Amino acid sequence: MNERARSPETRDSALSRPDRRINVVLRSASAEQAAPLSSVRARTLPSEGPWAEWQKELDRLVGLEEVKALVYEIYALLQVGQMRAAAGLSNSQHVFHMIFKGNPGTGKTTVARILARLLQSMGVLSKGHLVEVERADLVGEYIGHTAQKTREWIRKAMGGVLFVDEAYSLARGGEKDFGKEAIDTLVKAMEDHRNQFVLILAGYTLEMEAFLLSNPGLPSRFPIRMTFHDYTTDQLIQIAELMARERDYTLLPQTLQKLRQMVIAEKNARLYSFSNARFIRNVLERAIRNQAVRLLEQYPSGTPGRMELMDIRPEDLRNVDGWE
């Protein structure tokens, strides 16, 4: 069961940031990785055995080959650890606190949910739920309030994963800011409740790197780092088609051509804050509303046919972020 904090989001002042998440990003078999791999090489993962079900779930995600490989490493470590324990060999406990870096709409929250359930199934976590928070949920208004709020969210995350979005914002106010108290409380909980919950700090790549550099004691506490690269244009078109299909809509070839132009323009305009699949979702939702208006205008007293009810035409992409 997922818990989500309901409170106003905080934003970095240097860039205009989108303010909504997308948690479901699907893939097709031809998806390609968006950027060269760095710390973890893509590999062919097994499609049989105990891993098969997790592989099937990861296969539904577009791209993210580097991330998927790292998820498999975690699984392999735990699986072999169980084998070592059964053989009477030493099987030391591992730390699974993580850093997720990347732009919005690249699947960070979705992967966090999968990891929470994976760690529960392997005996690391007792519940496997995900609790999402941000700065406004953790930081209070007076001395002591922040620690109280932060401890309450940690309590809710026990047995699962605490996912702190835009974690870098906790350090934006300097030494006197209450965000530092939230960081200190999180670090203390990592020590006091070792192996009782997993902490994931997530945010934009550059901001997260600066955040870790400004807190010398933090990097060593997060041995697992995942970078979520922006999707390629082709991958975003695949995501759009799959999102539409899930809702029983069809994007016509001309519609896909126009959408591709929109994606390219948006990516060029927002080099450091492109919202990836979130942008696709927002465009699709606006197009569906436009289609509904168009059909009512065309059939004031009749009923459109089945195909007409499904088709999203190029003109349905009008009035979407300045596009006509």
Predicted regions and their residues:
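C-terminal alpha-helical "lid" subdomain
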Residues: N2-E53, E57, Q238, M243-T250, ...
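Pre-Walker A (pre-P-loop) alpha-helix and adjacent loop at the N terminus of AAA/AAA+ ATPase modules
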Residues: E53-F96
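Walker A/P-loop
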Residues: L89-G128, E152-R155, F222
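Short glycine-rich substrate-engagement loop in P-loop NTPases that contacts/grips substrate
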Residues: K127-A157
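Flexible beta-alpha connector loops of hexameric P-loop NTPases
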Residues: R135-T146, S169-K180, R225-T227
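Conserved nucleotide-sensing/catalytic segment adjacent to the nucleotide-binding pocket
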Residues: I154-G174
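A short helix-turn-beta junction within AAA+ P-loop NTPase domains corresponding to the substrate/partner-engaging
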Residues: L213-H229
